């Protein structure tokens, strides 16, 4: 018995449906002793909405993929679990070369589980940045409202952006929250 993690292709945007279909098939075929976990890795990110409101949302780390912890059977003769996964509506196949799926390495599994918050300490949601260094932005709130400038530095951990704005004819660096600026 070799329990490994495998990646399977799904139709993009249909990951939840494919997962639900697979979980139903696992129960229907009584394969709880062969297929242990089905995972759609996600992470929490902070998105800035109109009006500067912050919203924490879950984003898929690998759109179009499910990760399955299962016992695939021996090299020559894959077990019934392999066929059940392959025949699940919404799943297009295993990731791997040839007929035999390639298991994920322990490092890959650890990374996926850590980023998903399923292993180790849970990190604060990351801010999703809608702009890059060099982009023109407009300040929408605070003492510099209605100024425009160029992004010179982004600090996603702190949710801050440094913008060069022109004040009285001089370029001046100003540190602002992500919620205070929008792309110009």
UniProtKB/Swiss-Prot annotation:
- Does Transcription count among this protein's keywords? yes
List keywords of the entry alphabetically: Transcription, Transcription antitermination, Transcription regulation, Transcription termination
Q: Which Pfam families match?
A: KOW, NusG
Q: Which GO terms describe its biological process?
A: DNA-templated transcription termination; regulation of DNA-templated transcription elongation; transcription antitermination; transcription elongation-coupled chromatin remodeling
Gene name, please?
nusG
What protein name does the entry list?
Answer: Transcription termination/antitermination protein NusG
| NCBIfam families referenced in this protein's UniProt entry, alphabetically | nusG
CC per GO annotation: cytosol
InterPro entries documented for this protein: KOW (IPR005824), NGN (IPR047050), NGN-like_dom (IPR006645), NGN_dom_sf (IPR036735), NusG-like (IPR043425), Rib_uL2_dom2 (IPR014722), Transcrpt_antiterm_NusG (IPR001062), Transcrpt_antiterm_NusG_bac_CS (IPR015869)
Q: What does this protein do?
A: Participates in transcription elongation, termination and antitermination.
Where's the KOW domain?
133-163
What is stated as this protein's family in its record? Answer: Belongs to the NusG family.
